[in-house]
Amino acid sequence: YSQKKYALSNYQFAVVFENCPILRKEAIFDFKPQETKDFNESLNMTKNNEEKAALWTLYGYYADPVEAIEKVYTIDPKNKHLTYLLTRAVNIEENNLNRSEYIKYTRKSYVNESKLDPKIYTLVSEIANKNNTLNPYMWQIVAGYFETLKGNYSKATTHLNDAKKTAPQKILVQNQIKLFAIFNQVSKTKVLNTQTENELLPNLVWLYNCNKQIENATEYYSRETSNDENKLRTDFLVSWSRSYISNLYKKQNNEVMSELFSREDNYYAKGERLEKMQTYFLENKNTAWDKLAQSLYTITLEDIYEYKGIMFAYKNQIDEAIIEFKKCKKLDTLYGNPFNGKIMDCID
């Protein structure tokens, strides 16, 4: 490469990539075709299909993974690098499709289905249906994922069921398929009522508990961190599902349930909303769905009483404030005496 023999250099990196797994990262990072003609010259140097597929794989990392998949699949449908290219292509698609924003108390996540590249959708569907790759279940998973994005929920279910049957019976793999099945199930839900809530409940309980377990294992590092159950990427699906359900409730004018699933930064700015939430908590609803929603929410009835008391105090309505504070059963200890705060080191 330093001698500006780019075609030869890149061909050699492809050989390393193909034959020396331990140096694959180095081969990827050092692969630098300058122009199309350099890449074509490298292709002409290949001695077999394996080298040619490796060269296209490196091309796919930097340029167009979808084109690379098409080329490698034509060379050899069972080539070992196809799975890597598929993963790369999906990651790029997700960067275009998925969006998250952090608004004070919560993370809200959205999926823009319209941004799905039709080229990769068509190619993955064709390959999945032919079922002749080295890891057919991975193509079934991605095909199912894409069908969900296209709104073809029955097709998605078929692909994911096929993936579940043919995939290795490992916890990580099977749970990953389950995540896509949950995404499909939530996506096809357009109205929330007792029936749809009960249908969603078991999978959402599993998902949110799984996410808590992963967060705890990550925060408090232990041997459990390396367990397969803790390697799942659940955070976006958790955030997206809560945002999606919250938006459905909002469309149905159910402000309380919408708030429980995804907090709004100004929800309590309106007194009528505060009263609705207080009434909800006082009704002490204890269905399994309500318990799930309440477990996701960080505000309690005591917090509402305290907030109301503070608001009354600001308005110099002391008697009303005392009434609200008496309802609040929280036994918090102040870090310092608020009446001698002017004294230095009052916290001590």
What are these regions (language model features)?
Residues Y1-D348:
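Extracytoplasmic/secretory-pathway proteins
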